[in-house]
Regions:
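Core helices of alpha-solenoid repeat scaffolds
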Residues: 29-30, 60, 90, 120, ...
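TPR/TPR-like (Sel1-like) alpha-helical repeat modules
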Residues: 368-374
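An edge-strand/N-cap motif at the start of beta-rich repeat modules
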Residues: 29-37
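Short inter-helical turns and helix N-cap capping residues of alpha-solenoid HEAT/ARM repeat scaffolds
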Residues: 40-41, 70-71, 100-101, 130-131, ...
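Asparagine/serine/threonine-enriched low-complexity, disordered tracts
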Residues: 38, 68, 98, 128, ...
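Helical anchoring/docking segments at protein termini
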Residues: 1-5
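Structural detector for internal amphipathic alpha-helices that build alpha-solenoid repeat scaffolds
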Residues: 6-25, 42-57, 65, 73-87, ...
Length: 395
């Protein structure tokens, strides 16, 4: 049936000459609107778009064409009018998602969003059965609508062959924010397409707290790229990740402890200093190495606690503290100078060694004073430190 016949059928009532005259008038009205929509100038098209909403279904196809108009105001007006028409416009709008033009797709999705509930089931169906562009648009629309009932369907879209659909699926899940998406999104961190990996990361970050513990477990994924992206996601989540990561320092799995230590250093929250210092005594060497790097990354606030370990810790912890202080460099010079007069000769010796490694000219006079220390090992270390600083100065 032609769209003119559809239009006229809406107005049939009674019979006779009056009826025929009325139908002719309506036909002329329809044809004038149709001509304005398809052939008129900007003002005529805009007036027609605003006028045809109450006339309904016969104008759906011309309005669908209006979504492709060169002028934004016509595209927006067509979308608004299609939204008013409602359920009869859903199927044509879903088919219109096949258009690759982003501006057209945006207004098409807007119309479906305005229609609301009647569009949900057809959109869910379209995520499974349409052309890739239609599937992408359907997933995108469900995400924009925040449709929680579609979460399971959108999760399935993360597994399809088309990378564009997978990307839109990850983005849509971020808009909805349902924790059920966390595990599939972590799998998405290993997607072969960078765009999908980035959107999966962004969505995990936007989901926030419900994603933290699964991301921490992902720090020991067999795929190093997944581990790295999980760590970056935790860093991006930031403050909310700190306490769970601190708890993870006590995990039985050394890979978890190592990853948590590294991420805490990258986040840079000073609450983590004391727990990370505790990790300097970890049984696993790789955990201790990450603790040293994390403490150095935490900067000046870590110096005072490190100096305490430097003076009082056991051998393994002192070694880690020394490495961290060396990595911190010149900011550690003054605290180390202060312990050159410590009662313990071993503390004086190690402080002299570090000052030589750091190479700060400020330490020269204080190290010179150690050349008369009562302990021969301290005197030797002070001499070597002065030689190292001298070489750096003259280099």
């Amino acid at each position: 049936m032609s769209i003119i016949k559809k239009f006229l059928n809406l107005f049939k009532s009674g019979s006779g000459e009056e009826e025929e005259a009325r139908l002719r008038a309506q036909k002329e009205r329809y044809e004038s609107f149709l001509k304005a929509l398809t052939e008129g100038d900007l003002d005529a098209r805009w007036a027609a778009v605003r006028s045809v909403g109450d006339l309904g279904e016969p104008f759906i196809e011309p309005l669908i064409q209006g979504l492709k108009d060169e002028y934004w105001i016509i595209r927006r007006g067509s979308a608004d009018t299609l939204g008013k028409i409602g359920a009869p416009a859903v199927a044509p709008l879903i088919n219109a998602l096949d258009n690759p033009g982003e501006e057209v797709r945006q207004e098409t999705i807007r119309a479906l969003q305005l229609i609301g509930e009647p569009s949900v089931a057809p959109l869910v169906h379209a995520t499974k059965n349409g052309h890739p562009f239609i599937r992408r648009g359907a997933v995108q629309a469900l995400g924009i609508m925040g449709e929680e009932r579609a979460v399971a369907t959108i999760i399935e879209s993360l597994k399809v062959a088309d990378a564009g659909v997978r990307h839109e699926g990850a983005v849509a899940l971020g808009r909805i924010g349902d924790p059920r998406a966390v595990a599939p999104l972590i799998e998405g961190l290993n997607d072969p397409k960078e765009q999908v990996r980035l959107s999966a990361m962004a969505t995990l970050c936007s989901i926030g707290e419900p994603a933290i513990d699964p991301l921490i477990r992902a720090l020991i994924d067999t795929n190093e790229d997944v581990c790295r992206r999980a760590g970056l996601s935790l860093v991006t989540i930031g403050e909310s990740s700190v306490e769970p990561l601190i708890r993870a320092l006590g995990d039985q799995n050394p890979g978890i402890r190592r990853g948590a230590t590294e991420v805490l250093g990258q986040i840079g929250n000073t609450r983590a200093i004391t727990p990370i210092i505790g990790a300097l005594d970890d049984q696993e060497r790789l955990v201790r190495i990450e603790a040293v790097k994390a403490l150095a990354a935490l900067g000046v606030p870590a110096i005072a606690p490190l100096m305490q370990v430097f003076r009082e810790g056991d051998t393994r912890m002192r070694t880690g503290a020394m490495e961290a202080l060396w990595m911190l460099g010149q900011p550690a010079t003054t605290p180390l100078i202060m312990v050159l007069k410590d009662d313990q000769s071993d503390v004086r010796k190690r402080a002299a060694l570090l000052l030589g490694e750091i190479g700060d000219q400020k330490a020269v006079d204080h190290l010179t004073g150690l050349l008369s220390d009562e302990n021969v090992a301290v005197r030797r270390e002070a001499f070597e430190a002065l030689e190292m600083i001298k070489k750096r100065t003259t280099a």
